[in-house]
C-alpha cells in the first residue's frame, strides 16, 4: 500500500503520453496498483489530469462527470481523418475569406445547450469495441448525437496562414464534450472544415492547472495534491454526523435526508469523510463508502 495514503494528484500531462501511461508512472511512484484517472486526455493533449490513489479511486467517476475547461487552437480550412493534427488531411478548402465576425457568429451558434456527435476516434464503445479502433481500421463509425453544454466558447486570437486560419479559443463545457468534434462542427458551419492542432485542459471541476505538477517533479518529490478527505470537502458540500449516524453510514445504511442538493460528504466528529451520500426522498442513498466499518481505524 502507498505510504502516502489515499488522495488526489493533479498532473500536468505532457504531450505524447496516453492517460494510461500517466497512471502507470504514478503506480510506480506511489508503489501501488490502485491508481486511476478522471477523464481521458488524448496523447497530443496536455494539461490537467486528475489521478486517484488508493481509496480515492472511488470518487473518480464523480470527477469524470465534472465540468471542464480547455484552451485550444483550431485550424479552419482543413478536415482530417482524426479531427486533430495527427490524422491525414482529407480535404482542404480556402478559408482566407472568413472574417472574425463570421467566425464568432458561427461560434455563438455552438454555445449553450446543443447536441454533439462525438468524434469518430473517441473511446465510446460501438458493438463492444472502441470507436477509435474501428475508425483506424477504416471502418465506418456511426455515433449518436448527445446533449452537451458549452458555457463559454471564446475567440482569443486569429492567425492567417496562406489559405488557412488558425484560431486560439477557450472553452468551458460539460462533461462528455469532445473538443475535436467542436472544431469539426465549427469548420462545417463555416463551410471550410476544421480540426484541432493544439489542446490543453485547464480545469476539471475544482482542480485547475495552477495546482498541477509535472511527472518529473512528482517522481522527485512524491506527494499527494490533496488527501481523500481534503478532495471530498473541496468537491462536495459537508454534512456532520453523530456517532450513531457515522456508524450507520460506515455500514452502508441509509440516514434521514437533510435537504442537501446533489452528492455530499458525510463526516464523523473528527472531520473524516465516512461516505458520500445523496438525498433521495426522505432518506439518503450511499454513493460511496470511503471508510467502511470493516476498515482499520485511521
Curated annotation (Swiss-Prot):
Q: Which residues form the active site?
A: 42
Per the record's keyword annotation, is Isomerase included, yes or no? yes
Q: Which CDD domains match?
A: PseudoU_synth_EcTruB
Phylogenetic placement of the source organism: Bacteria, Bacillati, Actinomycetota, Actinomycetes, Mycobacteriales
Q: What does this protein do?
A: Responsible for synthesis of pseudouridine from uracil-55 in the psi GC loop of transfer RNAs.
Enzyme Commission no: 5.4.99.25
A single GO CC term for this protein reads:
peptidoglycan-based cell wall
Query: What organism does the UniProt record list as the source?
Result: Mycobacterium tuberculosis (strain ATCC 25618 / H37Rv)
Q: What is this protein called?
A: tRNA pseudouridine synthase B
Amino acid at each position: 500500500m502507498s505510504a502516502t495514503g489515499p488522495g488526489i494528484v493533479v498532473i500536468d500531462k505532457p504531450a505524447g503520453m496516453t492517460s494510461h501511461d500517466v497512471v502507470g508512472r504514478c503506480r510506480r511512484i506511489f508503489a501501488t496498483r490502485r491508481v486511476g484517472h478522471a477523464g481521458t486526455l488524448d496523447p497530443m493533449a496536455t494539461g490537467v489530469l486528475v489521478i486517484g490513489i488508493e481509496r480515492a479511486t472511488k470518487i473518480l467517476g464523480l470527477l469524470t462527470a465534472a465540468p471542464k475547461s480547455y484552451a485550444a487552437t483550431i485550424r479552419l480550412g482543413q478536415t482530417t481523418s482524426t479531427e486533430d493534427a495527427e490524422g491525414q488531411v482529407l480535404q482542404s478548402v480556402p478559408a482566407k475569406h472568413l472574417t472574425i465576425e463570421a467566425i464568432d457568429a458561427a461560434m455563438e451558434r455552438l454555445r449553450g445547450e446543443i447536441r454533439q456527435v462525438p468524434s469518430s476516434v473517441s473511446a465510446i464503445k460501438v458493438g463492444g469495441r472502441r470507436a477509435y479502433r474501428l475508425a483506424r481500421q477504416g471502418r465506418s463509425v456511426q455515433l449518436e448525437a448527445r446533449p452537451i453544454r458549452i458555457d463559454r466558447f471564446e475567440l482569443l486570437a486569429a492567425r492567417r496562414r496562406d489559405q488557412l486560419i488558425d484560431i486560439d479559443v477557450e472553452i468551458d463545457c460539460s462533461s462528455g464534450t469532445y473538443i475535436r468534434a467542436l472544431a469539426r462542427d465549427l469548420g462545417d458551419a463555416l463551410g471550410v472544415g476544421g480540426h484541432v492542432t493544439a489542446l490543453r485542459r485547464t480545469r476539471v471541476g475544482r482542480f485547475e492547472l495552477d495546482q498541477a505538477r509535472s511527472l518529473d517533479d512528482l517522481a522527485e518529490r512524491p506527494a499527494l495534491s490533496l488527501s481523500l478527505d481534503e478532495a471530498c470537502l473541496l468537491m462536495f458540500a459537508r454534512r456532520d454526523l453523530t456517532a450513531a449516524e457515522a456508524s450507520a453510514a460506515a455500514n452502508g445504511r441509509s440516514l434521514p435526508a437533510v435537504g442537501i442538493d446533489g452528492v455530499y460528504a458525510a463526516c464523523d466528529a473528527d472531520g473524516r469523510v465516512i461516505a458520500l451520500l445523496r438525498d433521495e426522498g426522505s432518506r439518503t442513498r450511499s454513493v460511496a463508502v470511503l471508510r467502511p466499518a470493516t476498515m482499520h481505524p485511521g
